[in-house]
Protein backbone atom coordinates (compact mmCIF):
# COMPACT_ATOMS: atom_id res chain seq x y z
CA UNK A 1 0.00 0.00 0.00
CA UNK A 2 2.81 2.37 0.87
CA UNK A 3 4.55 1.74 -2.47
CA UNK A 4 1.33 2.38 -4.39
CA UNK A 5 0.77 5.56 -2.40
CA UNK A 6 4.32 6.76 -3.11
CA UNK A 7 3.97 6.08 -6.84
CA UNK A 8 0.61 7.88 -6.99
CA UNK A 9 2.11 10.84 -5.15
CA UNK A 10 5.00 10.91 -7.63
CA UNK A 11 2.64 10.89 -10.63
CA UNK A 12 0.51 13.65 -9.09
CA UNK A 13 3.54 15.87 -8.73
CA UNK A 14 5.54 15.13 -5.60
CA UNK A 15 8.34 17.64 -5.22
CA UNK A 16 6.90 19.97 -7.88
CA UNK A 17 5.49 22.53 -5.43
CA UNK A 18 5.36 25.14 -8.20
CA UNK A 19 3.92 28.54 -7.30
CA UNK A 20 2.05 30.71 -9.77
CA UNK A 21 4.28 32.22 -12.43
CA UNK A 22 4.05 35.92 -11.61
CA UNK A 23 5.19 38.45 -14.20
CA UNK A 24 8.32 40.48 -13.49
CA UNK A 25 6.45 43.54 -14.71
CA UNK A 26 2.78 43.56 -13.58
CA UNK A 27 0.12 42.75 -14.35
CA UNK A 28 0.36 38.97 -14.16
CA UNK A 29 -2.23 37.56 -16.57
CA UNK A 30 -4.02 34.33 -15.66
CA UNK A 31 -6.39 32.77 -18.18
CA UNK A 32 -8.91 30.11 -17.15
CA UNK A 33 -9.98 27.45 -19.65
CA UNK A 34 -12.21 24.40 -19.45
CA UNK A 35 -15.57 22.88 -20.31
CA UNK A 36 -18.87 24.52 -19.45
CA UNK A 37 -19.93 23.43 -15.99
CA UNK A 38 -16.38 22.85 -14.74
CA UNK A 39 -16.75 25.77 -12.35
CA UNK A 40 -14.47 28.34 -14.02
CA UNK A 41 -16.49 31.41 -13.06
CA UNK A 42 -16.81 30.47 -9.40
CA UNK A 43 -13.17 29.47 -9.34
CA UNK A 44 -12.17 32.84 -10.81
CA UNK A 45 -13.71 34.47 -7.75
CA UNK A 46 -11.99 32.05 -5.38
CA UNK A 47 -8.63 32.62 -7.03
CA UNK A 48 -9.20 36.38 -6.91
CA UNK A 49 -10.08 36.18 -3.22
CA UNK A 50 -7.02 34.01 -2.52
CA UNK A 51 -4.73 36.44 -4.34
CA UNK A 52 -6.29 39.44 -2.59
CA UNK A 53 -5.81 37.69 0.76
CA UNK A 54 -2.17 37.14 -0.23
CA UNK A 55 -1.61 40.86 -0.72
CA UNK A 56 -2.26 41.18 -4.46
CA UNK A 57 -4.66 43.49 -6.29
CA UNK A 58 -6.55 41.23 -8.72
CA UNK A 59 -9.00 42.18 -11.46
CA UNK A 60 -11.58 39.68 -12.76
CA UNK A 61 -12.39 39.80 -16.47
CA UNK A 62 -15.71 38.59 -17.90
CA UNK A 63 -14.67 37.21 -21.29
CA UNK A 64 -17.41 34.54 -21.36
CA UNK A 65 -19.93 36.36 -23.53
CA UNK A 66 -21.80 33.30 -24.78
CA UNK A 67 -23.32 31.60 -21.75
CA UNK A 68 -26.46 33.42 -20.56
CA UNK A 69 -25.83 35.47 -17.41
CA UNK A 70 -22.14 34.49 -17.31
CA UNK A 71 -21.10 38.14 -17.03
CA UNK A 72 -23.63 38.78 -14.27
CA UNK A 73 -22.52 35.64 -12.44
CA UNK A 74 -18.90 36.80 -12.43
CA UNK A 75 -19.95 40.25 -11.24
CA UNK A 76 -21.86 38.69 -8.34
CA UNK A 77 -18.90 36.43 -7.52
CA UNK A 78 -16.58 39.44 -7.67
CA UNK A 79 -18.85 41.38 -5.32
CA UNK A 80 -18.77 38.52 -2.81
CA UNK A 81 -14.99 38.28 -3.07
CA UNK A 82 -14.47 42.03 -2.89
CA UNK A 83 -12.64 41.94 -6.22
CA UNK A 84 -13.51 44.36 -9.07
CA UNK A 85 -14.79 42.98 -12.36
CA UNK A 86 -14.11 44.23 -15.88
CA UNK A 87 -17.18 43.55 -18.01
CA UNK A 88 -18.47 44.57 -21.45
CA UNK A 89 -21.67 45.97 -19.99
CA UNK A 90 -22.61 47.71 -16.77
CA UNK A 91 -23.73 45.38 -13.99
CA UNK A 92 -23.29 44.73 -10.31
CA UNK A 93 -20.63 46.91 -8.74
CA UNK A 94 -17.99 45.16 -6.69
CA UNK A 95 -17.12 46.19 -3.16
CA UNK A 96 -13.48 45.84 -4.17
CA UNK A 97 -13.32 49.25 -5.81
CA UNK A 98 -14.87 51.30 -8.59
CA UNK A 99 -17.04 49.47 -11.06
CA UNK A 100 -14.92 48.73 -14.09
CA UNK A 101 -16.92 48.95 -17.29
CA UNK A 102 -15.49 48.51 -20.77
CA UNK A 103 -16.63 50.51 -23.80
CA UNK A 104 -19.86 49.37 -25.43
CA UNK A 105 -18.20 48.26 -28.65
CA UNK A 106 -16.48 45.36 -26.87
CA UNK A 107 -19.80 43.58 -26.32
CA UNK A 108 -19.72 40.25 -28.13
CA UNK A 109 -15.95 40.31 -28.68
CA UNK A 110 -14.21 38.36 -25.88
CA UNK A 111 -10.77 38.93 -27.40
CA UNK A 112 -11.18 42.72 -27.25
CA UNK A 113 -12.63 42.48 -23.74
CA UNK A 114 -9.54 40.59 -22.59
CA UNK A 115 -7.12 42.93 -24.37
CA UNK A 116 -8.81 46.09 -23.08
CA UNK A 117 -8.94 44.67 -19.55
CA UNK A 118 -5.18 44.17 -19.53
CA UNK A 119 -4.62 47.76 -20.68
CA UNK A 120 -6.95 49.07 -18.00
CA UNK A 121 -5.20 46.93 -15.37
CA UNK A 122 -1.92 48.61 -16.29
CA UNK A 123 -3.50 52.06 -15.99
CA UNK A 124 -5.21 51.38 -12.66
CA UNK A 125 -2.26 49.38 -11.24
CA UNK A 126 -3.92 46.00 -10.74
CA UNK A 127 -1.10 43.48 -10.39
CA UNK A 128 -3.09 40.38 -11.46
CA UNK A 129 -5.69 39.86 -14.19
CA UNK A 130 -7.89 36.74 -14.11
CA UNK A 131 -9.70 36.08 -17.39
CA UNK A 132 -12.83 33.91 -17.30
CA UNK A 133 -13.36 32.39 -20.76
CA UNK A 134 -16.29 30.64 -22.40
CA UNK A 135 -16.74 26.89 -22.17
CA UNK A 136 -18.74 24.31 -24.09
CA UNK A 137 -20.62 21.18 -23.11
CA UNK A 138 -18.04 19.34 -25.21
CA UNK A 139 -14.71 20.06 -26.86
CA UNK A 140 -15.01 21.69 -30.29
CA UNK A 141 -12.79 23.69 -32.62
CA UNK A 142 -14.77 26.91 -32.17
CA UNK A 143 -14.10 26.75 -28.43
CA UNK A 144 -10.39 26.17 -28.96
CA UNK A 145 -10.06 28.91 -31.56
CA UNK A 146 -11.64 31.48 -29.26
CA UNK A 147 -9.39 30.39 -26.39
CA UNK A 148 -6.31 30.55 -28.65
CA UNK A 149 -7.30 34.01 -29.90
CA UNK A 150 -7.56 35.30 -26.32
CA UNK A 151 -4.26 33.65 -25.44
CA UNK A 152 -2.49 35.17 -28.43
CA UNK A 153 -3.98 38.61 -27.73
CA UNK A 154 -2.94 38.91 -24.08
CA UNK A 155 0.00 36.46 -23.78
CA UNK A 156 -0.96 35.11 -20.32
CA UNK A 157 1.68 34.13 -17.76
CA UNK A 158 -0.50 31.20 -16.72
CA UNK A 159 -3.22 29.25 -18.53
CA UNK A 160 -5.05 27.21 -15.93
CA UNK A 161 -7.15 24.27 -17.08
CA UNK A 162 -10.14 23.90 -14.75
CA UNK A 163 -11.53 20.38 -14.58
CA UNK A 164 -14.40 18.88 -12.61
CA UNK A 165 -13.00 16.25 -10.21
CA UNK A 166 -16.10 14.12 -10.86
CA UNK A 167 -15.69 14.00 -14.64
CA UNK A 168 -14.36 10.42 -14.60
CA UNK A 169 -12.86 8.77 -17.67
CA UNK A 170 -13.64 11.77 -19.89
CA UNK A 171 -10.84 13.60 -18.09
CA UNK A 172 -8.18 12.08 -20.34
CA UNK A 173 -9.67 13.15 -23.68
CA UNK A 174 -10.68 16.57 -22.36
CA UNK A 175 -7.23 17.23 -20.93
CA UNK A 176 -5.55 16.13 -24.17
CA UNK A 177 -7.78 18.38 -26.24
CA UNK A 178 -7.13 21.47 -24.11
CA UNK A 179 -3.42 20.74 -23.83
CA UNK A 180 -3.14 20.53 -27.62
CA UNK A 181 -5.53 23.44 -28.13
CA UNK A 182 -4.19 26.09 -25.75
CA UNK A 183 -1.10 24.45 -24.19
CA UNK A 184 -2.21 25.13 -20.62
CA UNK A 185 0.49 25.56 -17.97
CA UNK A 186 -1.29 24.20 -14.91
CA UNK A 187 -4.41 22.43 -13.67
CA UNK A 188 -7.05 23.36 -11.10
CA UNK A 189 -9.38 20.69 -9.72
CA UNK A 190 -12.90 21.85 -8.91
CA UNK A 191 -15.75 20.23 -6.96
CA UNK A 192 -13.53 18.09 -4.75
CA UNK A 193 -16.16 18.42 -2.04
CA UNK A 194 -18.31 15.85 -3.86
CA UNK A 195 -18.13 12.07 -3.77
CA UNK A 196 -15.28 11.93 -6.26
CA UNK A 197 -11.97 10.74 -4.92
CA UNK A 198 -10.07 12.70 -7.53
CA UNK A 199 -9.13 10.04 -10.06
CA UNK A 200 -9.37 12.77 -12.68
CA UNK A 201 -6.31 14.35 -11.09
CA UNK A 202 -4.30 11.19 -11.69
CA UNK A 203 -5.47 10.96 -15.30
CA UNK A 204 -4.72 14.60 -16.14
CA UNK A 205 -1.34 14.63 -14.42
CA UNK A 206 -0.28 11.37 -16.06
CA UNK A 207 -1.45 12.24 -19.59
CA UNK A 208 -0.32 15.87 -19.82
CA UNK A 209 2.59 16.04 -17.39
CA UNK A 210 1.32 19.48 -16.34
CA UNK A 211 1.34 20.35 -12.61
CA UNK A 212 -1.86 20.53 -10.57
CA UNK A 213 -1.62 23.87 -8.77
CA UNK A 214 -4.89 24.33 -6.89
CA UNK A 215 -7.98 22.48 -5.70
CA UNK A 216 -11.46 23.81 -4.99
CA UNK A 217 -12.95 21.93 -2.05
CA UNK A 218 -16.35 23.54 -1.47
CA UNK A 219 -18.78 26.30 -2.40
CA UNK A 220 -17.35 28.98 -0.12
CA UNK A 221 -14.80 31.54 -1.30
CA UNK A 222 -12.29 30.19 1.20
CA UNK A 223 -12.73 26.59 0.01
CA UNK A 224 -9.69 26.90 -2.22
CA UNK A 225 -6.22 25.63 -1.49
CA UNK A 226 -2.83 24.85 -2.94
CA UNK A 227 -2.79 21.28 -4.28
CA UNK A 228 -1.01 18.66 -2.16
CA UNK A 229 -0.10 15.46 -4.10
CA UNK A 230 0.29 13.31 -0.98
CA UNK A 231 -3.18 14.18 0.30
CA UNK A 232 -4.75 13.51 -3.09
CA UNK A 233 -3.03 10.12 -3.30
CA UNK A 234 -4.54 9.20 0.06
CA UNK A 235 -7.93 10.38 -1.15
CA UNK A 236 -7.74 8.29 -4.32
CA UNK A 237 -6.81 5.20 -2.30
CA UNK A 238 -9.50 6.07 0.27
CA UNK A 239 -6.87 5.46 2.94
CA UNK A 240 -7.53 8.16 5.50
CA UNK A 241 -4.53 8.33 7.81
CA UNK A 242 -3.27 4.86 6.98
CA UNK A 243 0.19 6.24 6.21
CA UNK A 244 0.73 6.94 9.90
CA UNK A 245 -0.35 3.38 10.64
CA UNK A 246 2.17 2.07 8.11
CA UNK A 247 4.93 4.15 9.70
CA UNK A 248 4.08 2.76 13.13
CA UNK A 249 4.10 -0.79 11.78
CA UNK A 250 7.52 -0.28 10.21
CA UNK A 251 8.90 0.96 13.52
CA UNK A 252 7.36 -1.67 15.80
CA UNK A 253 7.17 -4.87 13.74
CA UNK A 254 10.36 -6.86 13.20
CA UNK A 255 11.13 -6.97 9.48
CA UNK A 256 12.67 -10.45 9.52
CA UNK A 257 9.72 -11.92 11.41
CA UNK A 258 7.27 -10.22 9.06
CA UNK A 259 9.01 -11.66 5.99
CA UNK A 260 9.04 -15.13 7.57
CA UNK A 261 5.30 -14.92 8.27
CA UNK A 262 4.61 -13.70 4.74
CA UNK A 263 6.52 -16.65 3.27
CA UNK A 264 4.56 -19.11 5.43
CA UNK A 265 1.27 -17.49 4.47
CA UNK A 266 2.11 -17.74 0.76
CA UNK A 267 3.01 -21.41 1.08
CA UNK A 268 -0.02 -22.26 3.23
CA UNK A 269 2.10 -23.28 6.24
CA UNK A 270 0.81 -20.62 8.65
CA UNK A 271 0.01 -22.15 12.07
CA UNK A 272 -1.85 -20.90 15.15
CA UNK A 273 1.52 -20.25 16.79
CA UNK A 274 2.43 -18.02 13.87
CA UNK A 275 -0.90 -16.23 14.20
CA UNK A 276 -0.15 -15.66 17.89
CA UNK A 277 3.22 -14.14 16.97
CA UNK A 278 1.49 -11.80 14.53
CA UNK A 279 -0.94 -10.65 17.21
CA UNK A 280 1.97 -10.03 19.56
CA UNK A 281 3.69 -7.93 16.90
CA UNK A 282 0.54 -5.87 16.39
CA UNK A 283 0.23 -5.42 20.15
CA UNK A 284 3.63 -3.70 20.18
CA UNK A 285 2.06 -0.86 18.19
CA UNK A 286 -0.10 0.10 21.16
CA UNK A 287 -3.82 0.58 21.64
CA UNK A 288 -6.14 0.15 18.65
CA UNK A 289 -7.61 3.58 19.52
CA UNK A 290 -4.34 5.12 18.35
Residue ranges of model-derived segments:
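Short glycine-rich anion-binding loops that position phosphate/pyrophosphate groups of nucleotides
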Residues: 134-136
Amino acid sequence: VKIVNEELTAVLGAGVDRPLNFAKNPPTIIMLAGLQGAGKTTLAGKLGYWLKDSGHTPLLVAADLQRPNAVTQLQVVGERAGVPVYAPEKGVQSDGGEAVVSPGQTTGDPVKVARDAVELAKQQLYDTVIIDTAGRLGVDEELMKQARDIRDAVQPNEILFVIDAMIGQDAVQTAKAFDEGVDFTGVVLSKLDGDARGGAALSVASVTGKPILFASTGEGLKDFEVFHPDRMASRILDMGDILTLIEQAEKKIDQETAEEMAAKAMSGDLTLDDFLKQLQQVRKMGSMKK
